[in-house]
Amino acid sequence: MKHNQMRQVVFPILAAFIWGTAFVAQDMCADAIGAFTFNATRYSIAVLALLVVILIRDGVKKDKPVLSAEEKKAANRQLWIGGLCCGAALAIASNFQQAGLVAGTDAGKAGFITALYVVLVPVFGLFFKRKVSVPTWIAVVLSVAALYLLCIKGDFSLAPGDLLLLVCALCFAVHILVIDHFTAYCDGVKLSCLQFLFAAIISAVCMFIFEPLDMPAILSCALPLLYVGIFSCGVGYTLQILAQKDSNPTVVTILLSLESVFAVIAGAIILKQQMSIREYIGCVVMFAAVVLAQIQFPEKKKAA
């Protein structure tokens, strides 16, 4: 497997693993601080963590590209626009997700509705003339079926909070497609850092408007906040951006949806939750979808 192919497969799987295991840390914060406070804090931590990485990397990097003043200006403009677009989509998606949970949607259904971006990404991609192969569409359907088995425990009926989560899924799909556009022009780590900067600003403004600033509550969640800030955001989302460079966004999305599988497994190992037969089947179906999405089928040759 070539280096680029390794990056396009391993990075999103690692991101999915980090996000799946981060649910434990998020649950620890949910009862202590509000959604906007949680997001503003974790995104701010991610900015600081990535700034350190950028400073160290740029300090030791020897083969820096030589750009003219005009080229630097154009590159910086693309970077800031990309950071703003990615950060806005991320902030809206994550805050709508938390609002849906606060409105009463259970975590399992929230996970399923949020992960519907697996379907929305290829559908939206059609409007940008991005072709999706038949095997990849089958993999998308399989992944949705797997998510249903993993996340939905009882009857599926729509509640008010579910509409907020549908908006969340739409925004995550937009987030993935915006990343797909800007990774062609921007440094992945710097783009990730700027998206967190704008997401932190948007969440902080909402926090000061809708939630009281409770420093003791924030400090009581210091360890889980550091985990989600550094690993879930700083590492996980940066891996997503690096994986999407020159990749098929639909295939990367299917790999990222492994988050639900890792969340179930983490719950079984860390929280000692019992996995049902239904969840085992869901894991198998999801892995089948991932394998199918990675198989390179030969294209049919047109008749002469």
Residue spans for each PLM region:
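Glycine-/small-residue-enriched transmembrane alpha-helix faces in small-molecule transporters
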Residues: 1-37, 41, 87-88, 92, ...
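Helix-helix packing/entry segments at the starts of transmembrane helices
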Residues: 16, 39-41, 110-116, 179-200, ...
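Juxtamembrane helix-loop-helix junctions in multi-pass membrane proteins
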Residues: 17-48, 105-109, 174-198, 213, ...
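Specific transmembrane alpha-helical segments of multi-pass solute transporters/efflux pumps
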Residues: 22-23, 57-113, 149, 229-247
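C-terminal-most transmembrane helix of multi-pass membrane proteins
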Residues: 43, 55-59, 221-223, 231, ...
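Transmembrane alpha-helical segments that form core, pore/gating elements
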Residues: 46-50, 120-122, 127, 157-211, ...
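C-terminal transmembrane-helix exit sites in multi-pass transporters
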Residues: 49, 53-54, 117-138, 261-280
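Hydrophobic transmembrane alpha-helices of multi-pass small-molecule transport proteins
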Residues: 50, 132-152, 172, 203, ...
